[in-house]
Each structure stands twice: as structure tokens, then as C-alpha cells.
Design a protein with these regions (language model features):
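A generic structural motif
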Residues: 10-14, 53, 62, 124-126, ...
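Regulatory inter-domain linker segments that are low-complexity and enriched
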Residues: 1-7, 91-171, 196, 204-213
Length: 213
């Protein structure tokens, strides 16, 4: 990226949709109360939620240990460890990983026949509580608006078949299925994630796009 390249953040979705913020050199905070990118009416933002870093013509974003996290749109298949959070449409989801197998030597409650290995994906609702969930043997777990393993028919930002998790004993590989609204993964706090024009970042209710200009 050229040192002369000018960058800006445009709010694509949220109460400030259409607003644009030019990014000067240095560290640019984003949150409800601190920094250049302020969204005081967003209840899901920390006072200082994330920081954009512009240095030597390069741009990165860093989550500042915010409770609701910073998410980036995936451009290729992304590896998920058990417990990882990702977002599709208006839904926050957690990949739970493989469920504990039932010991053949212990008594157990009656139920449907058990698969040799099940993998879990669950919705996280406001307050961090679990919502809808599914457990499937794999190798693929699908998420979308309808006709998928985990479906959310009322979500207008979800494609009919939005994303897939290709599961294995060590985790999962998350793939977006060419959707208009994309699939997002949560960044670990404190890690600087490189960005280029065209990338999208979600913080709280705000969907931000990196652009030249």
C-alpha cells in the first residue's frame, strides 16, 4: 500500500449510515465515548471499542478487549477453534466443537440413537445467553435463512444458504458461500489485523467499510 494512499471508514449499516471518517496517520479510536469514530447511541460499544492503526501506508484494526468484540469479514476459508465466535446476517454464533462422547461403560438417559461424534453450533443472544443450536455429525454444518442445519428464516441479511463449517476433531473451517452481506469472525483482543480498501469491520451495531479517498 502506498504511503500516499488516503483511507477512510464509511458507515454502511447502523444509525450513522452514510457517514465517512478520514483516517489520519497514527492510532484512531472507535467506540461510544473515546476516539475519532464515535457512536454514542450504540449500546453494544465499549467507550474505546477498537483502534485503527495507520502506519507507513499500512492499515490494521485492533480490538481493545471489548465485551461484544470486533469482527472482520472473511475473504477466504478461516480456521476456527472450538469456542470461536462468528457472525452471519444479524446472528452471532459460536462453534462449540466436538461434543463429549458418551462413555460405553456408564449408565445414560434414554434418548435418540447417538452419533459416534457430534459437533455443535449455537446462537448467542443478547446478554451472552445461548439461543438456538444444532448438533450434527458433519462433515459439513450449514447456516442460512432456510433449508440449512441451523436456519433463521426472518433474517433479511442472510442468504438462503449463507456459510458452512467443515468440521473435524481439531476444529472447523468456516467458508462464506459468496453472499452479499458476508460472514465475519471475531478478532482476538489486542491482535493487529491488517486491512485493505474493500474490507469490512463490524463493531456493535455498526458495519464499517474501508475505502480509498
Amino acid at each position: 500500500m502506498s504511503n500516499q494512499l488516503r483511507l477512510k471508514v464509511t458507515v454502511v449499516r447502523g444509525r450513522s449510515a452514510g457517514s465517512a471518517f478520514r483516517l489520519p496517520k497514527g492510532m484512531i479510536g472507535a467506540g461510544s465515548a473515546k476516539g475519532l469514530l464515535l457512536f454514542p447511541d450504540d449500546p453494544y460499544l465499549a467507550p474505546l471499542h477498537a483502534t485503527f492503526l495507520v502506519k507507513d501506508g499500512e492499515l490494521a484494526v485492533r480490538d481493545e478487549a471489548s465485551p461484544s468484540g470486533t469482527f472482520v469479514r472473511i475473504k477466504k476459508a478461516e480456521r476456527l477453534a472450538p469456542g470461536s465466535l462468528f457472525a452471519a446476517g444479524d446472528h452471532l454464533l459460536r462453534f462449540g466443537g466436538p461434543l463429549e462422547p458418551i462413555s460405553p461403560n456408564s449408565p445414560t438417559a434414554y434418548g435418540a440413537p447417538a452419533s459416534p461424534q457430534l459437533f455443535a453450533v449455537e446462537e448467542i443472544v443478547v446478554g451472552g445467553r445461548p439461543g438456538r443450536a444444532c448438533a450434527r455429525p458433519g462433515p459439513v454444518i450449514s447456516v442460512g435463512r432456510n433449508g440449512t442445519d441451523l436456519s433463521f428464516p426472518g433474517d433479511k441479511h442472510l442468504a438462503a444458504r449463507h456459510c458452512e463449517l467443515h468440521v473435524d476433531p481439531g476444529g472447523a473451517t468456516l467458508r462464506d458461500l459468496g453472499t452479499a452481506d458476508g460472514t465475519y469472525v471475531r478478532l482476538p483482543p489486542g491482535v493487529e489485523y491488517p486491512l485493505v480498501p474493500g474490507d469490512s469491520v463490524r463493531i456493535g451495531m455498526q458495519l464499517l467499510r474501508i475505502e480509498q479517498g
